[in-house]
């Protein structure tokens, strides 16, 4: 803690220093300094790593889930509908444990939006995450189209029956997924070690139910990629509006019921080992960001 404070104070002191007397006499400050500071503030050094992580995670998510769905659609004897749901839940679990400590493993534009709205994620990074997620999903879909040829439908999600039925289902199942996600990802009292398993199980359970009605997308990127590769856009708006409504309402609901426990002085409350590792990792990244910003300014 002392080390972090010293770095912060060092950065603050440096920003108040004036190394050229002419800047005071002329009433101006170096343009490059402000430009560099703005770039460092808005585009942190680790943003590229986060973006690449989201591309990879979303690619694998769509490749596995839509691949299983595409094969199942052509031959149910090879992969059942239950197998599709299990594959979707497992890949979400695996990716959370793989890159959750790097990018948060959003893999879903609606999830990123909800985190930003409720101040768990910086708005400035939202467009980069969206671009990464859609890029990963679209690339995975076209790779799948080439790999499982001659299957034409690459795991597309289309409504079965009236569109409003599918919309309601998408809102509810995405609500469930986001409610669980926000609980295990942001509440230190939750069992952090089971975060990936909890979210993956939520995806698996909801997709088992929703698969026969709406396809159980819960993810605009997961729908758009296969739609482009398969050239099927029936009810596409449902899979943008439904997940957004579901994630926002799910995040709002958990935020509303969340009990903010203020620890008493002298009490010892320990974080779970999983959350402690993530917290230390975030603190380390933040410290590295400060060091790199100071090096840029020097």
UniProtKB/Swiss-Prot annotation:
Q: Name one GO biological process term.
A: silicic acid import across plasma membrane
Q: Which InterPro entries match?
A: Aquaporin-like (IPR023271), Aquaporin_transptr (IPR034294), MIP (IPR000425), MIP_CS (IPR022357)
Q: Where is this motif: NPA 1?
A: 108-110
Where does the source fall among the domains of life?
Answer: Eukaryota
State the conditions that upregulate or repress this gene: Regulated by silicon level; the expression being decreased 4-fold by continuous silicon supply for 3 days.
Instruction: Extract the SUPFAM superfamilies matched here.
Output: Aquaporin-like
Compartment annotation: Cell membrane
Q: What stretches pass through the bilayer?
A: 51-71, 85-105, 124-144, 166-186, 194-214, 237-257
Q: What outcome follows a substitution of residue 132 to T?
A: In lsi; impairs silicon uptake. Grain discoloration. Reduces grain yield 10-fold
- Glycosylated residue positions: 4, 13, 26
List keywords of the entry alphabetically: Cell membrane, Glycoprotein, Membrane, Repeat, Transmembrane, Transmembrane helix, Transport
Q: What topology does it adopt in the membrane?
A: Multi-pass membrane protein
Regions annotated as coiled coil: none
An annotated GO cellular component of this protein is: Casparian strip
Motif NPA 2: where in chain = 219-221
Found in which tissues?
Mainly expressed in the roots. In roots, it localizes in the main and lateral roots, but not in root hairs. Within a root, it localizes on the plasma membrane of the distal side of both exodermis and endodermis, where casparian strips exist (at protein level). Expressed low levels in leaves and anthers.
Query: Its Gene Ontology molecular function terms?
Result: channel activity; silicate transmembrane transporter activity
Q: Which PANTHER family match?
A: AQUAPORIN NIP2-1
* Homology family: Belongs to the MIP/aquaporin (TC 1.A.8) family. NIP (TC 1.A.8.12) subfamily.
Q: What is known of its domains?
A: Aquaporins contain two tandem repeats each containing three membrane-spanning domains and a pore-forming loop with the signature motif Asn-Pro-Ala (NPA).
Provide the function of this protein: Silicon influx transporter responsible for silicon transport from the external solution to the root cells. Is coupled with the silicon efflux transporter LSI2 in both exodermal and endodermal root cells for an efficient silicon transport across the cells into the stele. Silicon is beneficial to plant growth and helps plants to overcome abiotic and biotic stresses by preventing lodging (falling over) and increasing resistance to pests and diseases, as well as other stresses.
Q: What is this protein called?
A: Aquaporin NIP2-1
Give the source lineage, highest ranks first.
Eukaryota, Viridiplantae, Streptophyta, Embryophyta, Tracheophyta
